[in-house]
């Protein structure tokens, strides 16, 4: 809707995992490098986790593009783990291009083993990637463990990559999955973007979509990062809504006011420390930035002086076990009283 207005060839902020728009920040480059190394070195079992919306699926699609571009690699990609064990093995065979006739689970396992041995003899790698792996039921996880046993005396026949939310780690830590856990050779947790990565991510998507100029102000990008916590999916949603509001308001530049309006509509709030970092960022900019920083310096000095003067009183007024055991404090310290002024 707004593409022509902003001089774009296509929507830059779709939430679909399009490898064309991939941005490889430091953490994403590290994750990709580990995945590629794990597959090429035939490590056998790899686990990658990340919070919802951090770009795991986009990265996996990019990995699949790279792997499928090699003649010596075959891949099977499972994006819906809600299958029975029987359907799971059948799905792997079909995705590997194996002609399957209806049979028993044993028939399927034998057919899979024969095809893996054939690939090994042809010096080919076979990779199974399971997305949303936190949704795997115990029976499927056990089956995956058994599949990881398919090997020769020198090499694993099947490279397995499990990708999921942090709940996957919690599942794998359960006592019943000890044997599976011991087979994991590589782990990686994909974090959210930092502020600079958020800026580069937005610029990268706009450039690929055909933008010839800057559309978001620095303040707008900072606000986007604060509101989204650096989560790529949320960045896409907020940027898309901001452009829509800007288009409706005939604004060719998206500033932080537009982003604020879009974020409020989407109920996106700043993080625990987001409000203060937002204030500090803006105090550091503009005509009176230097006076703002002087004020901060004086405030910090005041806090230090209070600690030096009342440190003994403050120390004796707390029962430190109360921080962990729920015991009540005796009095409010001077430092806390001072900080309450800013709350």
Per-region residue spans from a language model:
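Conserved catalytic segments around the Walker B and adjacent sensor/switch elements
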Residues: 45-46, 65, 69-80
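Conserved P-loop NTPase "ATPase switch" module shared by AAA+ and STAND
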Residues: 20, 116-140, 144, 167
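Conserved NTP-binding/hydrolysis module of P-loop NTPases
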Residues: 11, 73, 83-102
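C-terminal alpha-helical "lid" subdomain
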Residues: 213-214, 218-343
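Walker A/P-loop nucleotide-binding motif
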Residues: 42-65
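Helix-loop-helix "sensor" segment of P-loop NTPases
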Residues: 98, 118-123, 127, 150-152, ...
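Sensor-1/coupling segment of RecA-like P-loop NTPase cores
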Residues: 47-53, 107-112, 135-140, 148-176
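A short, basic N-terminal segment
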Residues: 1-41, 306-343
């Amino acid at each position: 809707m707004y593409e022509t207005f902003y001089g774009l060839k296509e929507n830059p902020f779709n939430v679909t995992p399009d490898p064309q728009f991939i941005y490889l920040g430091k953490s994403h480059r590290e994750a990709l490098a580990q995945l590629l190394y794990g597959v090429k070195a035939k490590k056998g079992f790899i686990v990658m986790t990340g919070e919802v919306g951090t770009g795991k699926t986009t990265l996996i699609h990019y990995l699949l593009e790279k792997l499928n571009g090699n003649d010596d690699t075959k891949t099977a990609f499972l994006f819906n783990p809600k299958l029975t064990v029987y359907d799971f093995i059948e799905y792997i065979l079909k995705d590997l291009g194996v002609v399957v006739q209806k049979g028993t689970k044993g028939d399927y396992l034998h057919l899979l083993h024969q095809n893996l041995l054939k690939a090994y003899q042809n010096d080919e790698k076979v990779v199974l990637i399971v997305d949303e792996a936190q949704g795997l039921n115990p029976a499927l996880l056990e089956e995956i463990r058994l599949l990881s046993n398919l090997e020769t005396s020198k090499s694993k026949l099947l490279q397995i990559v499990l990708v999921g939310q942090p709940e996957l780690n919690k599942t794998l830590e359960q006592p019943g999955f000890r044997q599976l856990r011991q087979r994991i050779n590589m782990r990686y947790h994909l974090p959210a973007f930092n502020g600079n990565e958020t800026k580069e991510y937005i610029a990268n998507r706009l450039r690929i979509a055909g933008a010839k100029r800057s559309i978001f102000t620095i303040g707008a990008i900072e606000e986007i990062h604060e509101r989204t916590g650096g989560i790529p999916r949320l960045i896409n949603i907020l940027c898309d809504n901001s452009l829509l509001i800007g288009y409706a308001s005939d604004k060719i530049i998206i500033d932080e006011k537009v982003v604020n309006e879009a974020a409020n509509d989407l109920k996106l709030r700043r993080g625990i420390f987001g409000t203060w970092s937002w204030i500090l960022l803006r105090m550091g900019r503009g005509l009176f930035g230097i006076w703002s920083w002087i004020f901060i310096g004086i405030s910090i000095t005041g806090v230090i002086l209070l600690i030096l003067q009342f440190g003994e009183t403050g120390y004796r007024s707390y029962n430190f076990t109360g921080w962990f055991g729920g015991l009540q404090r005796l009095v409010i310290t001077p430092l806390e009283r001072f900080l309450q002024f800013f709350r």
